[in-house]
């Protein structure tokens, strides 16, 4: 993304923002110091010659979306013109055993839109996007109109059964985007 965009992290108006659910938590058994996400961000920042100290967003399953919301707000505030958002997650025994304890891992291939779906398939991934004020650099032309983040502090692994936290986040996103509920064309469950 950096090479394709031509935007340099060394630019004072550019930020690098990292997003991860847990980081490289598998290193806790070896060298715990290598698990510090701020240290990881510093290494990435040095590698790309970043002018600004990279930020880290680590909010469990909503880390990626949270990072996009934070990046869009930083751009909208005028603090930055460009924000590279890079997300990554790695598999390790801790992660696999956690999802197994929730009985959420499918014994078969993942079928997310199938009525007979029976869980998820874990994997490792990394990806990056550039949020920018420069429309010519935008690969998609997509604008983040608004975002909402909430924490209903209900249960370690389950949202509130009332949906209060979700309703708050949706309401906040709509308010930030200056949209009403009628503007929602699709909900992805």
Regions found by a protein language model. Name each.
Residues 1, 44, 67-71, 75, ...:
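Buried hydrophobic packing segments
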Residues 12-18, 55-58, 83-88, 141-147, ...:
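Beta-strand segments within the central parallel beta-sheet cores of soluble alpha/beta enzyme folds
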Residues 23-70, 74, 79, 95-122:
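Conserved catalytic cysteine-centered active-site region
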Residues 79-101, 106-110, 117, 147-161, ...:
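Acyl-CoA/ACP chain-elongation machinery
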Residues 1-17, 169-181:
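Conserved active-site "lid/cap" helical segment
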Residues 19-21, 47-48, 59-60, 86-89, ...:
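Fold-independent oxyanion-binding glycine-rich loops
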Residues 3, 7, 46-49, 73-80, ...:
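Generic secondary-structure signature for well-ordered alpha-helical cores
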Residues 109-179, 183-186:
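Condensing-enzyme catalytic core mediating Claisen C-C bond formation in acyl metabolism
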């Amino acid at each position: 993304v950096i090479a394709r965009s031509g935007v340099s992290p060394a630019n004072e108006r550019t930020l690098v923002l990292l997003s991860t659910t847990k980081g490289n938590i598998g290193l806790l058994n070896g060298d715990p110091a290598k698990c510090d996400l701020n240290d990881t961000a510093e290494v990435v920042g040095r590698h790309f010659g970043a002018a600004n100290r990279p930020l880290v967003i680590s909010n469990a399953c909503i880390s990626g979306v949270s990072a996009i919301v934070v990046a869009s707000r930083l751009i909208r505030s005028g603090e930055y013109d460009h924000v590279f958002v890079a997300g990554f997650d790695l598999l390790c025994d801790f992660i696999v055993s956690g999802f197994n304890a929730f009985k959420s891992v499918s014994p078969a291939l993942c079928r997310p839109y199938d009525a007979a779906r029976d869980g998820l398939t874990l994997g490792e991934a990394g990806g990056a996007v550039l949020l920018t004020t420069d429309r010519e650099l935008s690969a998609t032309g997509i604008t983040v109109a608004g975002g909402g983040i909430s924490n209903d502090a209900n249960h370690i692994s389950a949202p509130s059964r009332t949906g209060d936290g979700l309703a708050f986040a949706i309401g906040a996103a709509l308010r930030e985007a200056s949209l009403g509920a009628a503007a929602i064309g699709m909900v992805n469950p």
